[in-house]
């Protein structure tokens, strides 16, 4: 964690920000290692404090040894009062707060308590998130394990699926397989969507039967030590029809073109275009209604985001970096028939990308 603190402190110095209050759970875990459900970090050029309540005192000692504990006691010593005390002690006049992760109620409580204090709150965005986009060796090792658990689960379950099973039964089988394979839990509610239901990119499993000869989208991932996997496959039980073969072939080719073209310094919207242009040329551009991919790590959706840029801003978007881990998931969705999506996770390397997902497709 010392390296992460050093990198954050360099960013704070560059921005002229003397301190940052880190409250987003994923950012808090990334910076400290603390996995509890309640707490915040105050990080300055010299100090690293963690505020949490009595439930987590022992846990902080185990998970966040680089941080000094300040215990929250409700209602006597809330976070806002502890923050004022620490700010005065550290001679702070400005503290950055994560604007995207502080609710109106939380901001009101902080502002009310600190109204007469010399400390000013400065809303900032994306500071820790930008550091998290490039994975270190420890993160990659955990991600590889989570992905392997996911791959093994879908590989084991698909041969067991039958047309007379429901979507919910299939989803449960996949969840059990990931638990038995070593996952802590699931990264998100598993999607199993058959036939017309698969035209909904974020469908939820129902009591509808899987059936024969129609598309079945499976979207799943194991969560391990805080890190997410994400995998989509489209299968067919029985003999697929001509339309399935055509749509599947287009989506698979689009994904392969994207994977072949990913590399550092490529703009994220240009990465999206690697697949989107092929799908559009095949006549299904309007049926590919989401971005090509998203970063995956401590959050299931994080940066970088591989999607179209706003008109006129195509040359101003963010670029891929070596160390990014991103999903690559083109899809085509036809109302009344169904959809096809194929998703793998890819690591951006020095000269291209490595496909981390290994399940058959």
Where are the language model's segments positioned?
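Active-site neighborhoods and metal-handling regions in enzymes and metal-associated proteins
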Residues: 1-361
């Amino acid at each position: 964690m010392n390296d992460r603190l050093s990198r954050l402190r360099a960013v704070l110095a560059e921005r002229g920000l003397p301190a940052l209050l880190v409250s987003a759970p994923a950012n808090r875990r990334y910076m400290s290692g603390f996995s509890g459900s309640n707490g915040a970090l105050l990080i300055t050029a010299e100090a690293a404090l963690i505020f949490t309540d009595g439930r987590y005192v022992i846990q902080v000692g185990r998970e966040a040894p680089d941080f000094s504990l300040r215990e929250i006691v409700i209602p006597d010593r809330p976070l806002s009062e502890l923050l004022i005390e620490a700010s005065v002690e550290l001679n702070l006049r400005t503290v950055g707060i994560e604007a995207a992760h502080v609710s109106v109620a939380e901001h009101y409580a902080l502002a009310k308590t600190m109204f007469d204090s010399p400390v000013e709150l400065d809303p900032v965005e994306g500071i820790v998130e930008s550091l998290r986009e490039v994975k270190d060796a420890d993160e990659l090792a955990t991600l590889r394990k989570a992905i392997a658990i996911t791959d093994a689960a879908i590989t084991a379950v698909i041969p067991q699926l039958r047309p007379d099973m429901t979507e919910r039964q299939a989803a449960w089988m996949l969840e059990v397989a990931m638990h038995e394979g070593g996952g802590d839990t699931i990264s998100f509610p598993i999607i199993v969507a058959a036939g017309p239901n698969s035209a909904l990119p974020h469908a939820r499993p129902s009591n509808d039967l899987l059936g024969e000869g129609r598309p079945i989208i499976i979207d799943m991932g194991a969560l391990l030590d805080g890190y997410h996997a994400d995998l989509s496959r489209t299968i067919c039980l029985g003999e697929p029809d001509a339309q399935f073969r055509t749509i599947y072939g287009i989506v698979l080719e689009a994904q392969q073109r994207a994977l072949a073209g990913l590399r550092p310094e490529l703009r994220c919207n240009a990465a999206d275009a690697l697949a989107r242009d092929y799908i559009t040329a095949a006549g299904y551009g309007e049926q590919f209604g989401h971005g090509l991919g998203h970063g995956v790590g401590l959050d299931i959706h994080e940066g970088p985001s591989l999607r179209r840029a706003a008109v006129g801003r195509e040359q101003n978007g963010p670029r891929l970096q070596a160390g990014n881990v991103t999903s690559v998931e083109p899809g085509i969705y036809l109302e009344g028939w169904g959809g096809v999506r194929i998703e793998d996770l890819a690591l951006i390397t020095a000269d291209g990308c490595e496909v981390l997902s290994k399940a058959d497709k």
